[in-house]
């Protein structure tokens, strides 16, 4: 399939190159959750830097749920038994804050991860994470270039090679950024 507007693809390539050149300004974050609703919580979180070094990888004990819904477990494989002995979000927060300090967070569907982290903080009566965010999913949608006229925007794409494990997904996001950065720029003929 050809790109709807190749100069937009170039913008995503340029973004990916910029991220890799300024790698010390960024971290990649991913979460796994009990679901997608207003009562759901983050139960796994990982943060890596742009060299792939793990800054945080932890399960989190949920407060509201005593069982992980089967639909969520079917996606990420996490069961309530796996969370036995895990830190609470409140206990984990200082490590999370340190792992992203002074860096912009890149996430795949950043809006979702930010929303669920904010929600988890409220549920746990914890401080909300203060950070700048960038969305790799929106960049990748623009890179792929599948235009949806009714939305007047690019079709969101699934994360290639996603493992539905927070750490594996962080690595998949890094791999995707590297792939986009290596793509030759489109030049008009």
Regions found by a protein language model. Name each.
Residues 2-130, 145, 152-160, 164:
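Conserved non-catalytic scaffold segment of RNase H-like nuclease domains
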Residues 165-179:
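Acidic, divalent-metal-coordinating active-site segment for phosphoryl/phosphodiester hydrolysis
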Residues 178-189:
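The feature marks non-catalytic terminal segments
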């Amino acid at each position: 399939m050809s790109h709807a507007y190749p100069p937009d693809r170039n913008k995503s390539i340029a973004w990916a190159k910029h991220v890799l050149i300024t790698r010390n300004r960024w971290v990649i974050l991913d979460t796994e959750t009990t679901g997608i609703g207003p009562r759901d919580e983050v139960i796994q979180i990982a943060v890596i830097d742009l060299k792939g070094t793990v800054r945080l990888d932890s399960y989190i004990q949920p407060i509201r749920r005593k069982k992980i819904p089967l639909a969520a477990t079917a996606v990420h494989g996490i069961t309530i038994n796996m969370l036995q002995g895990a830190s609470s979000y409140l206990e984990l927060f200082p490590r999370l804050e340190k792992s992203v300090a002074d860096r912009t967070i890149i996430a795949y569907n950043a809006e979702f991860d930010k929303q669920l982290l904010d929600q988890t903080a409220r549920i746990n009566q914890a401080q909300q994470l203060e950070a700048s965010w960038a969305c790799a999913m929106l960049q990748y949608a623009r890179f792929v270039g599948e235009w949806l006229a009714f939305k007047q925007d690019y079709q969101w794409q699934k994360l290639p090679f996603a493992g539905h494990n927070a750490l594996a997904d962080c690595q998949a996001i890094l791999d995707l950024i590297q792939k986009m950065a290596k793509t030759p720029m489109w030049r008009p003929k």
